[in-house]
């Protein structure tokens, strides 16, 4: 009978568990020139869990270590303790790694306490588990088996090739019982210099329960540890929106002002995420709302950029400085939101209104040329925006921008602030000459101011800007007609006499003595302007309004002064003389002092 036929018969008898037939084939018929031929039958017998056949094969020369697949691994997978003992007694290698698995690792994965204990008793090295299997074992092994490993003197501080220790992987796997067990058995939380285990940060990044963090802090993990990016646990729990952990860390005195490699604090991350709760917690625990540098925006800038009004108000309430240096000035950031309420809030808290952005533009210029609603420009001007401030790049003024954008509303607004119509840009152009075509309405507004300025100040001829304006008008027939109309109307206004000394022209200049203008407020020719006045009507009306306001202030101040003991007995005409010497601000102070 050929060996192939005998081999098949041997495999068949092993599968049928026929020990006598196995003995008969091997002892009587099957002569082996190569004992390795019994390796396959041995593995088959182990797989069949037939310990008697396995013992017989081993006694007759089967070599455990010649099998293609280790019989010991198979026995462990089957959970056959006696088979494991038999194989080990016959020389099975208890450290042999097959398909990435050692016998001890397989026993642990199968959670077979008996086999685990036996392998350890026979000298299996438990430390190879932590060196070779990293975090693979931590979710597979119950706490009781870890206790066995500790009993057999496993090193709790051993490092694998990544320089990670068992406690690191226990934290990574969020295994509270194991973390507690390791710490109770003196696992070290000290991180050697140059290593990056960062236990608390690892706990936060892997969504550990708050109880784990509390345990780690109890055993001495520093709450302000920083990783390779110089971030702390606070940075990571803020980024993940974990408010309970954030509160815990802050209660344990975590520093909210540590900056990472990007120079960002936890507060930067909280505001960037629009996280009101985290922002509040950090500020209440001392986070600096005014940290700033050249790398990252201020927290207030970030809140404004996010259009988060709640955060803006919160930061301002806690003292955020609206004038901190940043990559993009706060006022420009607020303008970008196109939200009038945000702009108003930061202006109300002292934001610098006359500051250039990175392109060298002023806030007022931006508001005009980007076609924002006129209320934005009005607000900026009310808070002190300089209507004559030039851009750094081309030296255009807001009036240049308004005319280039053909914005009648902006031109009218700027003119009401007595803007300089003679300002020239880098190319030598005034607002009037900076564009080829201007509408009649805008041209009339500008030219009427030029004509009026000339009447007031003959030295204008010395200004380059005035010369440029006159040259522009002289080269444009339409402009010349407008100038002629302005000159004719001014002549008509001068001919409207209010008395032997003054004409209606005194109302053309708001800087004239208001005390004189007040006397003519009720004059019929002032109350009802002539129909011939159209171009300069707004100038006169503006002056009338300011004079009316001053008249009321003087009248009210005299009336309220009757309650002031020092001057209540002063004759009324003297009181008028006194009040006329005061400016409007002083008059308001008198009224307010009595009202209090």
Curated annotation (Swiss-Prot):
Keyword Repeat: yes
SUPFAM superfamilies membership: Ankyrin repeat
Gene3D superfamilies: Ankyrin repeat-containing domain
Keywords (A to Z) from UniProt: ANK repeat, Repeat
PROSITE patterns: ANK_REP_REGION, ANK_REPEAT
ANK repeats mapped onto the chain: 5-34, 37-66, 68-96, 99-128, 130-158, 162-191, 195-225, 229-258, 262-291, 295-324, 326-355, 359-389, 394-423
Domain of life: Viruses
Keyword Repeat in annotation: yes
Signal peptide (UniProt feature, chain positions): none
Family annotation (InterPro entries): Ankyrin_rpt (IPR002110), Ankyrin_rpt-contain_sf (IPR036770), PRANC_domain (IPR018272)
Protein name per the record: Putative ankyrin repeat protein FPV024
Species of the source: Fowlpox virus (strain NVSL)
Lineage, opening ranks: Viruses, Varidnaviria, Bamfordvirae, Nucleocytoviricota, Pokkesviricetes
